[in-house]
Amino acid sequence: MISLSVNINKIATLSNARGGHIPNLLEHAKNIIRFGANGITVHPRPDERHITYNDVRELKKHITVELNIEGNPKEPSFIDLVLETNPDQVTLVPDDIGQLTSNHGWNTHKEKVFLTKTIKLFSNQGIRTSLFVDPDVKDIEGAKKTGVNRIELYTENYASQYSKNPEKAIKDYQIAAKKATELGLEINAGHDLNLENLPFFAANIINLREVSIGHALISDALNYGMENTVNLYLRALKKWIYTLQSLEMVNLF
């Protein structure tokens, strides 16, 4: 089964926009879980412009599914927060402080020493680790050398090319997933996945364990309601059965 982890940064942005608690982030997280999501993802940044560190602390106390914290480990405050809250998974992302959104993966060879040290720090506390990477075989080989448990494939390129040529858009990701599987790495994916492009991606990437989706899902919830939207994404992940033995795809709808 492919897990759906809902990134709630957009809800936190609205909640914190006026210094209050409307909408109530924790209650919305609980509802998302009740509607069937398998996990909650947060991406706290040092300036706390989306979700605050205190938000993360409160979520950890109360949610009943996996908590995935994303962020840049070169920020000491991020490392401290992760060690304090002890999430189920930490996803290391090479974004800068003022960056609007994540837009590239790690150069795992260049950053090998730093990443290995950081991953060991989290692993020693029992936290599953994941590295945000481009669909590049060399970077995936480098990721393996750091001791990380998983990679998260940065899917913006797939999403932007999907409508033009799905098979071409996904090719590099299939090659990357095959290499990761050969190396014993599990695979997560995220960035710009939505109801249109998610089923094809999920059907054609082997060993895919989790997708993290925030912007598109929260946007869809404005139109369809949160409960309906969460269920639409869960259905999107199950829309196709991918049979590795026969290489056949069967439409469930």
Regions picked out by a protein language model, each given a short descriptive name:
Residues 49-71, 110-127, 168-189, 233:
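Alpha-helix-loop-beta-strand connector modules within alpha/beta enzyme cores
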Residues 75-84, 136-146, 193-208:
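Catalytic cores of alpha/beta
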Residues 92-99, 150-161, 208-226:
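Glycine-rich phosphate-binding active-site loops on the catalytic face of alpha/beta enzymes
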Residues 2-8, 40-42, 67-71, 90-92, ...:
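Hydrophobic faces of well-ordered beta-strands that scaffold small-molecule active sites
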Residues 1-68, 73-74, 81-87, 142-145, ...:
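Conserved N-terminal beta1-alpha1 strand-loop-helix module at the mouth
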Residues 104, 165, 220-241:
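C-terminal helical cap(s) of enzyme catalytic domains, especially alpha/beta-barrels
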Residues 50, 69-75, 131-137, 189-196:
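Glycine-rich beta-to-alpha transition loops that act as phosphate-gripper elements at the mouths
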Residues 128-180:
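Histidine/lysine/aspartate-rich catalytic loop segments that bind and position anionic ligands
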